[in-house]
UniProtKB/Swiss-Prot annotation:
First-tier enzyme category under EC: hydrolase
One CC-aspect GO term: plasma membrane
Protein family membership: Belongs to the TRAFAC class translation factor GTPase superfamily. Classic translation factor GTPase family. LepA subfamily.
Main location per the UniProt record: membrane
Physiological role: Required for accurate and efficient protein synthesis under certain stress conditions. May act as a fidelity factor of the translation reaction, by catalyzing a one-codon backward translocation of tRNAs on improperly translocated ribosomes. Back-translocation proceeds from a post-translocation (POST) complex to a pre-translocation (PRE) complex, thus giving elongation factor G a second chance to translocate the tRNAs correctly. Binds to ribosomes in a GTP-dependent manner.
The species this protein was found in: Syntrophotalea carbinolica (strain DSM 2380 / NBRC 103641 / GraBd1) (Pelobacter carbinolicus)
Protein name per its UniProtKB record: Elongation factor 4
InterPro entries: EF-4, EFG_III/V, EFG_V-like, EFTu-like_2, G_TR_CS, LepA_C_sf, LepA_CTD, LepA_IV
GO BP terms, alphabetized: positive regulation of translation
Membrane topology: Peripheral membrane protein
S-S bridge residues: none
EC numbers, comma separated: 3.6.5.n1
Amino acid sequence: MERSKIRNFSIIAHIDHGKSTLADRLLETTGALSDREKTNQFLDKLDLERERGITIKAQAVRLKYRAEDGQDYILNLIDTPGHVDFSYEVSRSLAACEGGMLVVDASQGVEAQTLANVYLAIDQNLEVFPVLNKVDLPGAEPARIKEEIEEIIGLDASDAVEASAKEGIGIHEILESIVEKVPAPKGDADAPLKALIFDSWYDSYQGVIMLVRIFDGTLKKGDKIQLMASKRSYEVLKIGAFSPHPVEFSEMAAGEVGFVIAGIKVLQDAKVGDTVTHLHRPAENPLAGFQEVKPMVYSGLYPIDSGDYDALRDAMEKLRLNDSSFSFEPENSLALGFGFRCGFLGLLHMEIIQERLEREFNMELITTAPTVRYRVITTKGEELIVDSANKLPELQYIDQILEPFIVASIHVPNDYVGGVLALCEEKRGIQREIKYLTSNRVMVVYELPLNEIVLDFYDRLKTVSRGYASLDYEFLDYRPSDLVRLNILVNAETVDALSLIVHRDKSQMRGRELVAKMKEFIPRQQYEVAVQAAIGNKVVARANVKALRKDVTAKCYGGDITRKRKLLEKQKEGKKRMKQVGNVELPQEAFLAILKVKE
């Protein structure tokens, strides 16, 4: 295939702006899908992707299209995830393209994540052109949204295609503008091989399948290849492309996009962003932009039935085959038994992994409150990395604790700015700027501690803005903070699974909330149970779960008061003894209460 006839493009859109439906229409119009395969969201292969309406893994589809100039073109659609947790995957998918189609909902306008992804695309020097989707909706205002795109992003939207993926309007015009506006790929087919892995997943029959974009050189079946970051070498067994069903080729040259299967057994060898080159004629430098993806959020996952521990480990191993950014290590807790400490890219990633474990592997799980990675400098001058409250040393050994900060940009309609500002201030935010994008939309930029975001920030942001605010964030740096460990004691015993790391100013309030919540969920015992929140030895909040009382004097009719007194004294003795040896069973709800303490 000659290079001038190839177009590599991706679709950039916010969640729910109709990206996957649009991709379906492009597949149908170019004849890639037969009638019986027209499922909605054909590219979203995981059930969870369809259900939540989000794209998690990247996909690449090769479409054949005969344009109005009578020439046959090959269009490679590279589908990207749209969520902030997966921004590294997005940047790699965009690096594989020359053009980006910015899809904006004609009734909603530009959102924060769209903006973040557009800037990623512009940084990679992509040719970005706008398309308005959902113009058939009664609330659509194409003219206003075009102005908004020009004002906020600075793209010329005067000739933007007005389309409706659902009704099939404007699909032909979109295909024509891809051919016209997206530049043909550059590259030298005779240079040493350089190919970018922009996604990889594990297939139980063929090993790891890599999606690659070839920048220089030619790749043939049977070639010996080397992965430059992991330094491993393999022999190519199959190459081909999805259109959208797999079609095998004997070779692929510079500018093309396709899949490579090389009998790789571990996903960790074929990391997203790595460069593939020939073993015997390697490229001098890898392609720029490769990063090791680091988890930002940590949480403990425990099986409800401790007999499921091995099954849970197997399930996690399987998920890790398909998701190299998910990491876990065994840990145990007195309250919950054996489980795993897991690292995730963000909250959505955490929810998805949990849901996939519950759904695909029928696991029943308890999750502990999410935390972030702190750096602790001890009095001896050592630096520790702490990702759970139980690993924090005692107060007297700590010199300072540093916590990760992020910079968050929040897009919100004018009417709700006050609520958003109040929320950011409450979460210990530092205001950077407030920018009026249009007469009605505001961009608020704050520096916030990641610790405050992982618990419930996103839900509360949606609440104060009635669902209109959109959030995008990136990691900033580590800063010293006055943080302490808050322990929850039930019956004077610390429950390790409920410990939290909080800011000292908030510790008392947080302690009170937790204790009040715990009091609701602990079943009443025969004796009084004290629930306390403590920092070190200092108790900051307390609540009592009242005792159940059996009426021991019921059998006495009249008679002497001493008889009744004797029975009551005996009961009191029994309760005292019971309290010394008694154990309080904590129900599952108590752990979940900690997660949702704000509601």
